[in-house]
Amino acid sequence: ASSDVLVIGNDIKGMKYRFARCCNPIYGDEVFGFISSEGVIKIHRTDCPNARNIRERYPYRMIATRWSGKIGDQFAATLRIVGRDDIGIVTNITSIINKEKNATLRNISIDSHDGIFQGHLTVGVSDTRTLRELIKKISTAKGVKDVQRAL
């Protein structure tokens, strides 16, 4: 990861960081850094399921972190999607994603029971605005009942 996408502390240079797998932050999310025992800064979303535990138990290992003005690579975001199991629903959803120039479908898994499908889509997006637009478009697809960013 290149350090020009994030500003850590008072713009500390050369810090190694990784995006936490528990919450998969993307450009535009509110984030904080957690200095791991290996000395690597793990970047978490402020609404991460682990954030409260970190704040309570390790406040001294937290470091202020914010995004710089530069949008970098694509970030993986997982969406949970529920809807009516119709023929062509997956094709409709994937074509919506394929039409977005700033989004890439990375993974899809869908299960169907009793006429209802549930699935997870992993998409590559450059920022939260792109993700919100994509969620809005997918939610308007015929048969889709709910689309949310998964944690």
Each model region followed by its residue ranges:
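Short beta-strand micro-motifs in enzyme catalytic cores
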Residues: 77, 117-119
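Short hydrophobic/aromatic beta-strand micro-patches
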Residues: 82, 122-124
